[in-house]
């Protein structure tokens, strides 16, 4: 019997396939992106230690006050700028981008472009 896999399960499989190839190091940590139906999250992770070095999301109170909606492209752009600013303050300039199994389009692309514009290299 053939059972169709859910979109969420297919995204997880794509993410595992990507994670086989992408790892974050102390010199070049991983910029991981996750989006839910309501918010968008970004974190910079050192995979050798398993530590999150920097994080930002549209769930944060200071970002929500600046946004009309927490789930649109404008929110993703703001999260990208904030994550880049916080990373540069910690001395992180180069990262590896992990799209988290999501298509590189729309919100994910907007976050990546704004992080690049704010000074992160990837």
Swiss-Prot record:
Keyword Ubl conjugation: no
HAMAP family with a match to the protein in the record: Ribosomal_uL18_B
Swiss-Prot/TrEMBL GO biological process terms: translation
Organism: Dictyoglomus turgidum (strain DSM 6724 / Z-1310)
Oligomeric and partner information: Part of the 50S ribosomal subunit; part of the 5S rRNA/L5/L18/L25 subcomplex. Contacts the 5S and 23S rRNAs.
Coiled coil, from the record: none
Lineage: Bacteria, Pseudomonadati, Dictyoglomota, Dictyoglomia, Dictyoglomales
GO cellular component, one term: cytosolic large ribosomal subunit
GO molecular function list: 5S rRNA binding; structural constituent of ribosome
Name used for this protein in its record: Large ribosomal subunit protein uL18
Matching Pfam families: Ribosomal_L18p
Cross-referenced InterPro entries: Ribosomal_uL18_bac-type (IPR004389), Ribosomal_uL18_bac/euk (IPR005484)
Family affiliation: Belongs to the universal ribosomal protein uL18 family.
Disulphide bridges: none
The entry's keywords: Ribonucleoprotein, Ribosomal protein, RNA-binding, rRNA-binding
Span of the signal peptide: none
Task of the protein: This is one of the proteins that bind and probably mediate the attachment of the 5S RNA into the large ribosomal subunit, where it forms part of the central protuberance.
């Amino acid at each position: 019997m053939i059972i169709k896999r859910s979109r969420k399960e297919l995204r997880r499989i794509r993410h595992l396939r990507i994670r086989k190839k992408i790892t974050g190091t102390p010199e070049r940590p991983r910029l991981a992106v996750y989006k839910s139906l309501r918010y968008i999250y970004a974190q910079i992770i050192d995979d050798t230690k398993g530590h999150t070095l920097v994080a930002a999301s549209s769930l944060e109170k200071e970002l929500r006050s600046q946004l009309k909606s927490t789930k649109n492209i404008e929110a993703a752009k703001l999260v990208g700028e904030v994550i880049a600013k916080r990373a540069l303050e910690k001395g992180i300039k180069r990262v590896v981008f992990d799209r988290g199994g999501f298509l590189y389009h729309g919100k994910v692309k907007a976050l990546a472009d704004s992080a690049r514009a704010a000074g992160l290299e990837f």
